[in-house]
Amino acid sequence: MSIQFFSYDVGGLIVKEVRLLILWRRSALPNGRTLFARMTQALRIASSDKKYRSIFDRTSLLAFFATPHRSTQHQSPESVALALLNQCYCGLISPWISIFPPNFSKVVARSEVEFRPPTRAHILNVFQDPGPASPIKDSVVVHKSCAVLGVDGEVLIGLDCSHYTLARLLKARDKRYLLRQASHAALRHGKAFQQVVGLFFLDSIRTFDAEGPKFECRKVVSQLASLPQLQSWRQGSVDSRVLWFGTPAMLDPTSLFRTLRSQIQEENQLGDPIFIRVDSTLHRHNELSEPQILASMCQQILRQQPQLTSALQDLLLNVEDAAVGSRDCWKQRTLWNCLLVLLYHPKDAETFCFIDATSSLQTKNLAGQLESVMKESEMPLRLIVSCRSTAKQTPEASTQVDVDLSDAGFDEPLRQDLEEWIRESLECGLTDSTLREALLTQILSSGDFHLARHALEFFASTGSWLTKWSVPSVWAMLSKQSAAELFIEDNIRRHGQWLLIPMLWALEAFEPMQVDEIDVALMLEDNGVAGQVEDFINLLPGISTIRRGVFVIADHVRPAFDYLWGKYFATYQHHVYLAKSCVAALRHHLRVTPAIPQLREDKSSDAAARLCTYAAMNWVRHFSLQRNSETTKYVPHPTIITANETDPGSPNEHAGVSEAFLEDPELSRLWITHLRRALDLDGLDEELGHLILPETLGSRLGICTGWAIRISRQLASMRLSSERDVTNSLLVIGSETDDLAMVQSCLSADPSPTEHTLGYALAAASDPIKEKLLQQVGEPSDEFLYRALLSSICFGNVSVTEDLLVRITDKVRVAQVTPLEGSKLQWPQANESSESAETFRHTPLGVATAYGDADVIDLLINHDISWWDLEERSPPPGTWNALHHAALGGQRNIMCKLLLQQRKGVLNSSARIPNTVTESGNTPLILAASRGFHKIVALLLEDGSMRGYGVDVNIQNEQRSSALLAAARYGFSQTLEMLLTYEGIDYSKTDSNGASILHLALVNDREAAALQILAHKDIFSNEMEYQEANMEANSVNNFEDDDSFSESSVDTTDVVYTVPARPRISLHQKDGSGLTSLTIAIWRNLKSIVEILIAMDADANGPEGEFEAPLVAAAEVGSFELFTMFTKIGATKTEAALNTISTGRTRPLHAACAMGHLEVVRELLKDSVTQLSHTDSNQRTPLCAAISRDQNHVISVLLDRETETGLQEGLWEAARSGKAHILDQLLRRGAEINAQDEYGNTALQWASYYNKPRCVERLLLGGARLDLLDCDNVNALGDAARSGSAEPLKLLVDVGVDVNAEAGGDTALCRAIWAEEVECVSVLLQGGAKFILSSAQSRFENLLTFAVQVSSPEILRLLLKAPEERDLAPTLRSACAMQSTSQLEVLLEFYDPAKVDLGSGWTILHLAAVHGTLAGLTKVLDHATGRAALNYGPKKVGTPFEMAAFSSKESLSKVEHLYSNAALPGLVQPSSRFGTALNAASYRLNDPVVVYLLQKMQLEDINASGARYGNAIQNMLASAWMDTERSLKLLGILLEAGVSLTPTSADRHGTALHTAALFSPKPLVEKVIETSRMLADERDGEGRLPIHLSALQEEWASMMLLSTTTSTIRSVDKMGRNAVHLAAAAGARSVLEKIFEVEENEDLLLEADFDGWTPFHWACRGEDDDCARFLIEKARKIFDSKWDSMKHELVTTDEKTWTPLDVARFHQRREVELLLSLGMTTSDAENWMPDQSQNLGSYCDSCACQIWHEEHHSSALHCKKLYLRFNGWSRMCQLAPTAKRKYTPTLLGYKTCFKVADNLVKARLAKVLVPHSQGPLQRKGRGKGEGEEDEEGIATVENYPVSQSCGVEMIRAFVIDDRRIQPDATRNLNHEVSVGSEDQTQMSLGTGRLFVQSVDSPLEMVMDVAAIFLSSPKSAHKQDETTRAFATAK
């Protein structure tokens, strides 16, 4: 085991790497002491050594993996814990330490003195945490019980895996996997740490596994690190350096380099941390090509600086071609461009690259080129090149350091140590191949998998392994064994895994470095094989696997396959098992590689389809770098097949690449399909897919198998939509590969390819193909030539470029115009395609400059063509020109050439060109300065001086960064010096964060740059000078907003600048964070700079309101030297200074206490002890700050001086922080355990909320009260429940707290459910918590509904499992309406329809159909009970299909899904609301669903009607007011489909015109009338005409449309009502005004209906006072003198009739004017108060909806405008003969239900029944059966007539006149009323009423409700129900 500690620019990491060394020494793990000693060394160096203080300060994460172990074979937990305490952490106590050793206290004390832990860092602790059902059985355990450290900031991550798997987390070859897992885990647990740029692990040399040689290796490296050359390389902090070292053949350079890196880091004399990332794929036994090295360097840079991926967006045209094209020179060219962009892009940290150059002279020269490239910039880059060289052989390049371990002049002691090291490592006797063969034979025969793996790992480190060991030799070795077949079969059955690994290794199926990935893929465990034997048998053919993008089967593997297939799977195809063989291994690759795109789910069950899916994704992984939503391709194509089959790596060398694709076209099709999916491309049709098959291409083009496969792969990765696209692509491929035959074939197939294709092919063509293509073009256009020219420059095809230049020049000269004027060559506009915009984005000169082609630039300049001058074409603002490209790429020579040509006048550019800006606001000067190109900066500054104009050095880009600010930020000393001394520079410029050049240098740790800036003391000023200079500069020239330098300007006059007095920098200036330069320097602990700033009169005390006072910063940093420095210079420890609170941070004493700086604390407390009571901005005392960071040594000092108040504050902080040992100290010193802070929180509440079980336990034992509440009325139990503190909650429950008590309106269970804390809910349920919904959550129906809405499925399942009675009905309704289906799935597990009543015949399928989503509906249908209700529906509800059509959520999808599951779309239920699904969809105006249903339904079903509105058209018209336009469209659809305007239910609902008149706007009415004019004369079931309903809707325009000879305003319905009655009832004053404008209509004013109600009655019944007022005023005018007598009739109240006044009073009409008009005096009106209803509830006589509250108005919006039965349902038998109604009286909100069969109803009448016949109300005889009592005192009501107009509401009316009390009614109050049989009960239908009076005063008695039902009419249709009368009273 080993511990590595490494640091980098943003943090540090401690990682434990576990490795089982069982090759030759199968012993236990190394002693734990070694582990802890090494970790101690790293931590002590980081915490105490001044050299490494920056590393310690920046450490943000400590990661422990598998620490410590607990096993019967290893150390006990106690000893491990003691060692950990002694060697690593001080004062650490964990509950698993059961027995403390005798010397425990001494160890702790010694640890506290010797070591201070890095308390700032977060701790990530990974351990084993198997579940109760986990199959893991492991002897070595890393469990929570022994791995938890118990320190602050610790994040615990439990994994259900074996120790073997856990330990191997750090051995994964793809280190990004571990990085991703660590970062994700930390983020999931709420711990954010700084960005980790990479991971590196120190490991032993792979060649030698013994422990000794590893330390000898470190000895060698230690001597190597002490070499002067290496010291020089390490000390260069700014310049880019190259380190060369040669290694013997037996020494793995990668391993040596790893050890070297570690040694350099540990001995780093600089303050800057070093980080180096080595790609595991770099170690190869074959020679790397130049493109491979370039690609590897790009990968290494991007892994260290992942943010640089955005820099690749600006690459030019052929970036993608490098991955798809064929010519290596173009690949290399593009990769160079990518590498230069990454090298030169501004970076805030150093970058390291490693090259294993082996013995290739070519790669050594490449490294030399890189060194020269690096010298052009000041950007820091470290390049390490490893060369396996022979004696006297050095790299052929000029390098700064040459170190060759094999050189004769090499340091002799170092040589001796190295040779001894190698000799000792070979003493095992494996120096010769014979011994290796013998050992391998022995290992394979033994069946020991672990031994075989490590032996093969050892052998694979030598270069001769892959050639010496092959499949034939291994297979022959196995076949030599006796009974070979039996032997193999037996080993397959018993040890299926061990045989596969050697064969895979020997065949190079996987690289040797990937052995652990194979282990994981095969799911191997320590003690056995996981999986079925058949799985491993299927994996044996995995010897042939994915190899560089092509699936191949090597011929020398065929014998093995033939044997295995013949033995086990003779009846199956080969490729099927090849697919199975790769699935497991590839799955691991896909899991750990984030760059692989996610494929759509493949529904194919064929194994070959799975193979192609994984293979395609594996191929994409090789060349794609995922960047957000884009993919930048820069790695060369991985295919190893070349045109020349005799080349190395060709098919012939591999004994014939598999012809599986040609033999099986189906496999080829699958491969192409999944490859296109992996690239996110559209699929191909069958014909197009056939064209790109390898066999088709081979026969069409006459090419070999290898090329056919490769071209097929290229075509499969392109966007193809037609056969022409295939031909054009083949033309380009033929041009790229210089295949004239392919080009001719393509031109023959398509003689007229697109200009884009021809231009691309021409740019890539050689001379013969170029001539052929130019002949094909004929007379090319300027645009074609321009596109081809740009492409040829990108490809570096000089020959084509020169030819095109000649052609363009001739064309221009002949035309005598510039292409800008005479052709279509223009810059792309906004409406042009992105492809065109990208093509024309750069000029030819700019493209050539970007690629650094000096020859092409000369060619462009020397041609007499003016239109590529930098200004001639006047590109739009923000366009890059050649100077930008030269500055961006560090092309100094090209920059010189361009500037020189400008001076000569060859390039007719103006003086403003060097000041033009890109889209980001960058000038060439800013680009060069931000990349450290100091020579280019000097050129630009010098050129401006020579030409007589000034380069604007003060321009700032979008980020407000100028050239000077960029140089200061990145510490480019030479660039910075030039700019600081340049005339006209503005030193006071700041960036977007308000940082000056000095701020940037200090913030980015550029100490040298800061010193360089401070050396120019003349640029600094005091505050007054600073303000004056700024004012002067702003008044002279302010160029920031000046647009005179816009590139689009046509003014070419040179600009002469007026140089103002330059503003200087103030030392008091603050950046955007409020920090001064002095404060930043203190934070960085830069003492020398602090001294300089103080000497320059920087304010040591800081100005008033300073964000971070220097004294506070010094106290927090803990530098006693800095602190005393401030004391000496005058920053005295005055009370004001010490009490300074830096905004948002802390005081000096608080900062020192929190950081544990004891010396500073004592210094601060010398003179002012009162500081202990001061609080910071977080209201914490210094003691609290020390407790929060567990600074025990500071706490001891503070406790001796604390007051009682301070001790109390400390107690709360200790409880919050979980410091139990400090809690004990504070309680012993007198802190009150039950004290409450200002928010009412006690220590117990703090500990409970923050999950500190040890503190809770101590407080409970100390007698803490459980009933105390905080300011939110929450107790400790509620705090623990809502914060997820399960352990403290368990402690509280165990001590007996009431778990069902409410606190603050919530119970603990409700809080835990709301917080989604499963453990807490479980604890509470086990503790006896009941299913009680708290008062604060009363808006939910029950606890389960509350859990469904606010909590997780796990908690819901936990509640459902509890043995509590529960009602699932409301819970199911709530779950069905949710978007997520997780809660619904849980409920379905417990759903039993027999036990759950959803009401009114509803089923769960109905709920899901109307309220749920498609996913929820699918879940319900999949349930056992869901499908049972598919075509079932209650009468009033309808079927699920009907509900889905009515739904507003995914209605069409749900309808389609139900139909696919056998739902009947034509099912008709006339009694339901809509009747059919079509009607429901029409009402919802859901035209897609309507169209779908019309296609599925029969013609006879589409006209079916429902109970509410009628057929589909009527339902649509009923809701047309919501969307008129959509309704008109839907009406046309329904009419076209044959839906009738006169439905079968017209006798009940009327025609469609009735519905339109009542609900729809005028356009719909017009549309219906146009369709059928005759409908205006049709009547509905109540005799109403459409004009009646329009009057009710107050639509006068519609009434005019509906007027006919038989349909007028005088027409009456069956109740004798005309349009005036209905308009008055609806309050339609505008209609009444129109009607009474005609004098002939005045008689309608007093027209009475059959009940005797005039428009006055109906106006008083309505709600519009204006309408009643209008009628009264109109009556006064019409009747004039007769009005007084008429008015008396209107207000006279008697027992016979209801006057308008009665109606107004009953309906609470309070308008004084109306009442006065009805005959009341002024005094009576002022004192009159309406009768109150005593909160009586009942049913509305209009809509049967419940009525509540004092005023008798229905709560339903459609009460008036739907059924129009304003005065009661008492006439229902006559109005709607087919309808059946039941009325349920209510009393004070509680229903009293009566069954039909009941003949006796208990009631107490308050008034006799008053019978009458036609005419005035009269009383009949008073005999028995006529309303009197019988012998038993029971009154009968059989023969009493009931008024048609009184209705139910009149029965429940209150006494209006107390004087009309019948004296004989009192004796009937306590008697029952009997209801006669059907034959006996006959009620006349004349006008009359049933009236209720009071015995006493109406204000003293609460009246009861009486309701009466009418008998059926005298017709042939008799009702089934008898007429009943009900009456109730108290």
UniProtKB/Swiss-Prot annotation:
Gene3D superfamilies (UniProt xref): Ankyrin repeat-containing domain
Q: Which UniProt keywords apply?
A: ANK repeat, Repeat
InterPro entries in alphabetical order: Ankyrin_rpt, Ankyrin_rpt-contain_sf, Multifunctional_ANK_Repeat, NPHP3-like_N
- Pathway linked to the protein: Mycotoxin biosynthesis
Q: Which SUPFAM superfamilies match?
A: Ankyrin repeat
Q: Where would I find the ANK repeats?
A: 840-872, 878-908, 920-949, 959-989, 993-1023, 1073-1102, 1106-1135, 1144-1174, 1178-1205, 1206-1235, 1239-1268, 1272-1301, 1304-1333, 1339-1368, 1400-1429, 1514-1543, 1548-1577, 1615-1644, 1651-1680, 1696-1724
Other remarks in the entry: Trichothecenes are sesquiterpenoid toxins that act by inhibiting protein biosynthesis.
Function of this protein? Ankyrin repeat domain-containing protein; part of the satratoxin SC1 cluster involved in the biosynthesis of satratoxins, trichothecene mycotoxins that are associated with human food poisonings. Satratoxins are suggested to be made by products of multiple gene clusters (SC1, SC2 and SC3) that encode 21 proteins in all, including polyketide synthases, acetyltransferases, and other enzymes expected to modify the trichothecene skeleton. SC1 encodes 10 proteins, SAT1 to SAT10.
Name of the protein: Ankyrin repeat domain-containing protein SAT10
- Give the organism the record lists: Stachybotrys chartarum (strain CBS 109288 / IBT 7711)
